[in-house]
Amino acid sequence: CEPFTCGNDEDMDEFFRTDAIAYAKFRMGKSYCFRLTQNPKKIVACFTVSNDSIRLYDLGSSKKNKMWKDFSNREKRLSRYPGILIGRLAVAKEFAGQGFGSEVVRFIKEWFVVEDNKSGCRLAIVDAKNDVKVLAFYERNGFSYLFQTERDEFRYINLSKSEQALFAQNSPRSTRLMYCDLL
């Protein structure tokens, strides 16, 4: 394939250029790409998925109750709800702003709700870059914040020492946890 660049995120470009292979080798995530039919060497978009879950018992009562409203009593006893994590998603620079990102998200959601899917999952999960455009993109595609505030989100995750320092300074997180119910 021709070299891929999303043009605005060197970390993302580097991931798909070099790290995606190691992620697959160590079963940390699986990357896929969409290519042009008329030119299969031209990559339109790339994404990486892996299994994940959300610990519902760690959530506040209002969020937990909202997520549980459609679950049966038997399901409520689960401490974790399985999901598919969209770990990375990027559209090639020349195709940006044309709806391809939304098409990829729609594809991923549909891929995991068909009867012959390989992984049971109730949720699509993303740890989205804490950027206004990125967060708005996921909201437009049906995702909601797992936590209303970053402070609540800091409490949910296991903080590294650097994140603990940010939390103490009330600094923003670099990412925000979001989810979409696939039912």
Regions inferred by a protein language model and the residue ranges of each:
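Non-catalytic substrate-recognition and accessory regions of acyl/acetyltransferase enzymes
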Residues: 1-98, 102, 106-125, 129, ...
